Amino acid sequence: MRLASAGPGSADCNRSTIVAPSPRQGTIPAGTGWYNPAMTGRERVFRTEAVILRRQDLGEADRLVVAYSPDRGKLRLMAKGVRRVRSRKAGHLEPFSRTSLLIARGRELDIITQAEAVETFPALRAGLQRLGEASYVVELLDRFTFDESGSRPAYGLLVDTLARLAADHPAPAVLRYYELRLLELMGYRPEFFRCVQCASEVRPEGQYFVPAMGGVVCPRCGRSVSQARPLSLEALKVLRHYQRSGYEAAAAPTVRPSVRQEVEDHLEAYLNHLLERRLNSPRFLRRVQALEAGAEVAVVSRNGAGPG
């Protein structure tokens, strides 16, 4: 599938346009921005920059660290002794941090020998809402990528998205833009301009969205397609705008809350279909939002401004 760049005006569009294969095709053409270190042999020691996606405690003092690098893709690394109080590496391996790593090859897991944070994005860990949003960003990349198969455009998109959330950009626009760009880079660009059943050009009216078919279905075809989800014209326009615009242009329009929720629901259904299971972070975010909404109601009630 031939992919366009992120569009003019976005922080991640200055990277070159690539032709990324669908993961289902299995063959990665040369010169596309994808890199597999196995092709050049395994060095004993190497340095790379990476974003920390997640980590897991091992034994009494160690941690398994999963990170994403622009040139080496997803890495599963051992950070020895990092949980000890005097460890110099601990503060440089926080989730979401952009870190420079020196890595030595190991028998089962490669070992982090040095770590120096380039950018830590502390705002992403300052509250549950931002924590959940950042967790969603890294979880989505984690689910879509494979070990040691890197993509510089995907890494650039990841860093730009975390930076936008840390800078308090509106999360709905940041996340929807990220989802559509990542889908494009992974070879799963949804079709919003032609019916995926009959290939006719989509008219300016309500349509259907079918996750299993990867795009919109016209009203005539939609009546006979199972699992077709009604898609309003307004939501279709928003999806098209996000897909073909750079970030600044995509984030500019004000979207009604009901339409914003519809767009989110359709993309979540598509992602769940592709990944064949639900993501964890959206459920966490919904719980946080419900708690915050309940707290706001309680405050209003205590102030005597509630109903009645």
Segments the model singles out, each with a brief description of its role:
Residues T32-G308:
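Non-catalytic alpha-helical scaffolds and adjoining flexible linkers that form interface surfaces
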Residues S5:
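Zn2+-dependent metallopeptidase catalytic domains
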Residues S22-P23:
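Intrinsic disorder
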Residues S16-T17, G26-T27:
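Generic short N-terminal amphipathic or hydrophobic helices
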